[in-house]
Every structure is written in C-alpha cells, then in structure tokens.
C-alpha cells in the first residue's frame, strides 16, 4: 500500500488552462449524453464523474492527461449536465450507456478513471466488458459493493444523518476547506451546474459482493482520501483483500474529492498507473 508523500497542503493549486476539446451530445439507445473529447491518436482515458459532478469537473485532469499523450474523454451520465434525465419506467444501465458511448466514439480499449459514484459505473463496466479496459482507477468508492460485509460496513460508517449535511462539507476534507476557500466556492459552482435534475436512479448489470470482486479481471488502482468520511482507507483495504490485481493509495489530508483537492498527486499517481498498464 502506498501513502502520499506530504506536499504543502496550504498552497492551493491553480486550475490549468484547458486544451481544445470537441464538445457534443451523443445520441445513444434510449438517451442523449453530453461529452467532450480531446481527440488524437493517443490511448483513450475516460473519466467518470462523482454524483456531485459531471463532465465539467475534470478541469485539473483534462490538459495534464492530454499533454501526456492521451486522448481524454469525459461525459455526463443521465441526470447530469447536458444529458437527459433517466426515466422512471426505463432508467437504463449506467455501464451500458458508457459502452454505447465508446462504441459511438470508435474507442476500442481504454483506461477508466473514476471518482465516487463514477466508480460504481466503472466497476460494473469492468465486470461486463473486461476485454475493453486496459485499467480501472476507482477513487472514493466501494466498487459498487451492494451485498456482503463491505457494503454493510460502508453503511455503518455513513449514517443517514450525513445526508443532511451540505454536500461540500462532507465531500471536501478539512485541510482543503481551510487552505482553499476559493476552490471550495468553485467546487460548489460546478456541483450546482452539474446536478441538473432528479431523474430515476440507474441500474447496474452486476451484483457486487466480496466473492464477485475476486473475479475482477482488470488491474485496479484503488484510491482513498485519508479524511474521506464516506469511503475511508479502511473500506479500500477491505476491497483490496478481494481484488486480484490491485494497488491501494491513500491520499494524505484529503476528503472524498481527491481529483479536486489533491490534483497534482492524483494526476501523477494515475498517470504512473496507466503508464504501466498500456497493453
């Protein structure tokens, strides 16, 4: 297990200038999803956003991964910015929306990089279409575990009262809130812009249990913020017991949004991981 070397947590990281990217609305079976794509001949990296975000939130990652030679793609799931709502009678399966999107974009194999709720979709995809993934990065998510002791423990450490707290309070760690109040406000703006409607909750194709995790065929990077109230390092260590090929990274002085709170470390760690799983 790897732990972040302590950078200075009191120095805010400025948002870098974005590189050109095509923005569009993908017309898929049963829905339309907003996305952006930097294009090019590089290996694709597809970013899957948290429930607090959308395709808009990857400001720290887009130019860094593109300049590292990758084709960078992000999209908004149903119920989020520029995408349709999920219908009550047919909400669809999030991982199949992802599959339909990459088929439309002509992507053969790719690296999936996810945060929080995006990790549930990415993991579901890894079970349904492992042949399409070069690697799987999951930050701040229990890999969609719905049954078994991991899911039960996650429920215990995240009581219902948590939902009454402001989202920014329990998603952003105390070090970040102290060091970067402007970043907190920007995060709030993106959160407000991302959550465009309350459609139905989408379904998953696979029921994830500890036994199911042991069948995962994709190399996995498991990241947890040391101060994450929702998915702390303890949950990631439980998951790591069952995932055959995994690396666990604990991000120091970080809450639930490591891609935003500690972007330089997040980017370095993920770039190193995907670089070692190119084939």
Residue ranges, per PLM feature:
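Acidic catalytic loop of the alpha/beta-hydrolase fold
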Residues: 227-231
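Catalytic active-site module of serine/aspartate enzymes centered on a nucleophile-bearing elbow/loop
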Residues: 246-279
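Flexible "cap/lid" loop of the alpha/beta hydrolase fold
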Residues: 123-128, 133-163
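Conserved alpha/beta-hydrolase catalytic His-Asp/Glu region
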Residues: 147-148, 159-215
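Short beta-strand/loop motif that positions the catalytic acidic residue
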Residues: 216, 222-224
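Short alpha-helix in the alpha/beta-hydrolase fold that links the catalytic acid
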Residues: 218, 232-241
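Conserved HGGG/HGGXW glycine-rich cap/lid loop of the alpha/beta-hydrolase fold
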Residues: 31-84
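Active-site loop/oxyanion-hole signature of alpha/beta-hydrolase fold enzymes
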Residues: 62, 67, 73-114, 268
């Amino acid at each position: 297990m790897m732990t972040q070397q302590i950078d200075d947590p009191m120095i805010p990281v400025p948002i870098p200038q974005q590189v050109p990217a095509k923005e569009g609305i993908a017309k898929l079976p049963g829905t339309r999803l907003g996305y952006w794509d930097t294009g090019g001949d590089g290996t694709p990296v597809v970013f899957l956003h948290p429930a607090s975000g959308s395709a808009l939130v990857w400001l720290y990652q887009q130019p860094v991964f593109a300049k590292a030679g990758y084709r960078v793609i992000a999209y908004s799931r149903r119920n989020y910015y520029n995408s349709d709502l999920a219908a009550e009678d047919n909400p669809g399966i999030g991982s199949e929306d992802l599959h339909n999107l990459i088929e439309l974009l002509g992507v053969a194999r790719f690296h999936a990089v996810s945060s929080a709720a995006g990790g549930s979709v990415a993991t579901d995809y890894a079970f349904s279409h492992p042949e399409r993934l070069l690697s799987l990065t999951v930050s701040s998510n229990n890999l969609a575990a719905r049954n078994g002791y991991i899911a039960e423990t996650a429920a215990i450490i995240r009581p219902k009262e948590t939902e009454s707290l402001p989202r920014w309070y329990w998603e952003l760690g105390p070090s970040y809130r102290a060091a970067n109040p402007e970043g907190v406000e920007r995060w709030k703006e993106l959160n407000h812009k991302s959550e465009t409607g309350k459609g139905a909750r989408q379904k998953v194709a696979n029921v994830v249990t500890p036994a199911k995790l042991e069948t995962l065929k994709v190399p996995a990077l498991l990241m947890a913020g040391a101060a994450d109230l929702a998915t702390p390092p303890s949950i990631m260590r439980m998951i790591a017991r069952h995932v055959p090929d995994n690396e666990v990274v604990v991000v120091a002085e970080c809450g639930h949004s490591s891609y935003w709170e500690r972007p330089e470390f997040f980017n370095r760690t993920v770039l190193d991981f995907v670089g070692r799983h190119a084939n």
